């Protein structure tokens, strides 16, 4: 997959192009990431990349005269690579955008070319959004200093779904949210830590039972911690049965806990 990034601080992206899963993907040629810095399109001696907003007020906006050429050049590069326009998308990281979730990540990973625009200052001219941006995306309802970190989140999430990037073919399928659910608990050696033991089922070697346990824990953890993810979700018969079992086990555990709290101390 090819990803183009428009950013005033391309050096920040070395965190994902040189390290970890995405760094290995770049080294192996599975993922290619190129950069366009609007500052390279400045014509004045100060290489100005910001401008005052009409109407006054605090803050500055990214300069149109340097931002648009960077986006246009990234689009042309995608075309030169033979990427179909219908499978090329320019996205802008913005608080006004669609919330990024795993379904959205899958949509973006199906593209041939993804161009990510990382904003700075107070944002970009609305006319640039209308003319040059295909979609706006957000990673959450909070304020950051710029779009580079959200862009890195998007690039990392998308690259994980590129065939061959993850070492194990099922890793992406088993990630949290891959099926709209939280992940199940995981355990490694040793079998006992401070008196806490690995669940017996995981030591049984019964792969069918382990799969069932993991699905139950995934459903239950979602019900406990992110119940909104289950709203409107149609569970199949097995999923509903496992969730009901988990809820019943939780109720039993809580009742036992309350009984223990009320038990008088022995004299």
Swiss-Prot record:
GO terms for biological process: tRNA N1-guanine methylation. Transmembrane segments: none annotated. Its EC number is 2.1.1.228. Homodimer. PANTHER family: TRNA (GUANINE-N(1)-)-METHYLTRANSFERASE. Belongs to the RNA methyltransferase TrmD family. This is tRNA (guanine-N(1)-)-methyltransferase. The gene is trmD.
């Amino acid at each position: 997959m090819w990803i183009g990034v428009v950013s005033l601080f391309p050096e920040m992206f070395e965190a994902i192009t040189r390290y970890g899963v995405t760094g290995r993907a770049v080294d192996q040629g599975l993922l290619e990431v190129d950069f366009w810095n609007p500052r390279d399109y400045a014509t004045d001696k100060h290489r100005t990349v910001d401008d005052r907003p009409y109407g006054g007020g605090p803050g500055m906006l990214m300069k149109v005269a340097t931002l648009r050429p960077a986006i246009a050049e990234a689009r042309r590069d995608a075309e030169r690579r033979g990427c179909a326009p219908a499978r090329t998308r320019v996205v802008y990281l913005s608080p006004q955008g669609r919330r990024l979730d795993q379904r959205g990540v899958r949509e973006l990973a199906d593209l041939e070319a993804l161009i990510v625009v990382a904003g700075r200052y107070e944002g970009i001219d609305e006319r640039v959004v209308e003319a040059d941006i295909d979609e706006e995306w957000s990673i959450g309802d909070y304020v950051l200093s710029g779009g580079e970190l959200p862009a890195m989140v998007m690039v990392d999430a998308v690259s994980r779904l590129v065939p061959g990037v993850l070492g194990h073919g099922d890793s992406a399928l088993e990630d949290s949210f891959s099926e709209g659910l939280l992940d199940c608990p995981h355990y490694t050696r040793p079998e006992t830590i401070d008196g806490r033991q690995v669940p017996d089922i995981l030591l049984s070697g019964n792969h069918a039972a382990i799969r069932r346990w993991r699905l139950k824990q995934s459903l239950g953890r979602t019900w406990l911690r992110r119940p909104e993810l289950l709203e409107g979700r149609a569970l199949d018969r097995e999923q509903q049965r496992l969730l009901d079992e988990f809820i019943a086990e939780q109720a039993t555990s809580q009742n036992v806990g309350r009984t223990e709290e009320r038990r008088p101390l022995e004299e």
